[in-house]
Amino acid sequence: MFYKIAQKVMFQMDPERAHNLAIGSLKMTGNSPLNCFYRQTIAPAPVTFMGLTFPNPVGLAAGMDKDGESIDAFHAMGFGHIEVGTVTPRPQPGNDLPRLFRLKPAKGIINRMGFNNKGVDNLVRNLIAKKSDIMVGVNIGKNKDTPVEQGKDDYLICMDKVYPYAAYIAVNISSPNTPGLRSLQYGDLLDELLSAIKTKQLELAEKHKKYVPIALKIAPDLTIEEIENIADALIKNKFDGAIATNTTLTRDGVSGLANANESGGLSGKPLTELSTKVIRQLAACLKGQIPIIGVGGINSAEDALAKFDAGATMVQIYSGFIYQGPKLIKEIVEAYRLK
């Protein structure tokens, strides 16, 4: 009930202003009695992923809490893990406003945020300051003004700084809102990046005496051949996991709606089937050697179960969480326990 009232107010506001207000409010209330308005108890449904044990298979996707400011509040809602970021080595403002748009009739969102964040050093401070013991994955990317050819350096800088504090690290090469970023998904650029990241991971594991798994986040706008090539590169470079998928550049199912022609990545319900298709194709290519987090268009427990059936071990929500609220977490976990 509280969420529906809050949502009604927020949906009258500019989307980015509403988002910032929500994150700020959650930051203030995460460890206070006021978290009673969104705190919920989720029955355990443990799942093992990349060698880690999570209390349940439902996570918060990257992009909601980019700078890790409200981790404790999201823990109170019952998430099994939170993925913060995308974070870059240096702070950057992102793309020009406006850059976030609701497509309410389709339960979709278009964003062209452009990795706006306060930088990796700020994120590390927030990871150190968090009170809860929730699993936190850190999604890393490159700065906009870093040439693609030098992009791997940005990923290695972020890895070096977040490694001691992350449950896992997610490598984001699939956002459509940083020029040239998606080119890292192909050919020699992909192989060079994954090889450099794996080498760095092993160095850091030795230095810190702990192994932090690494997953690659991919786009939904890929051909089967491209998916096969990515799968081969993941296996070759012994990556620990994959996250499928990011937002799409397609506009299937939203034609004619207000804001549908805005540039950027489309998420939410219009992405559901495409994301599930990519998960199924990727799982077939990986042949059980590398586990997958399924994300994209999960608006119900049924949507999540479809991701599991397609080959995902865990799922993440973002747009569905905005439209459905924290109850979606509990609904998915309960359905997972019964499946």
From Swiss-Prot:
Annotated GO MF terms: dihydroorotate dehydrogenase (quinone) activity
Binding site for FMN: A62, G63, M64, D65, K66, T86, N139, N172, K217, T245, G268, G297, Y318, S319
Keyword Phosphoprotein in annotation: no
GO BP of this protein: 'de novo' pyrimidine nucleobase biosynthetic process; 'de novo' UMP biosynthetic process
Pfam family, one: DHO_dh
Gene Ontology CC: cytoplasm; plasma membrane
Note accompanying the cofactor annotation: Binds 1 FMN per subunit.
UniProt-listed Gene3D superfamilies: Aldolase class I (3.20.20.70)
Pathway annotation: Pyrimidine metabolism; UMP biosynthesis via de novo pathway; orotate from (S)-dihydroorotate (quinone route): step 1/1
Topology in membrane: Peripheral membrane protein
Principal EC category: oxidoreductase
Family of the protein in this entry: Belongs to the dihydroorotate dehydrogenase family. Type 2 subfamily.
HAMAP family documented for this protein: DHO_dh_type2
Record's protein name: Dihydroorotate dehydrogenase (quinone)
Organism: Shewanella sp. (strain W3-18-1)
Taxonomic classification: Bacteria, Pseudomonadati, Pseudomonadota, Gammaproteobacteria, Alteromonadales
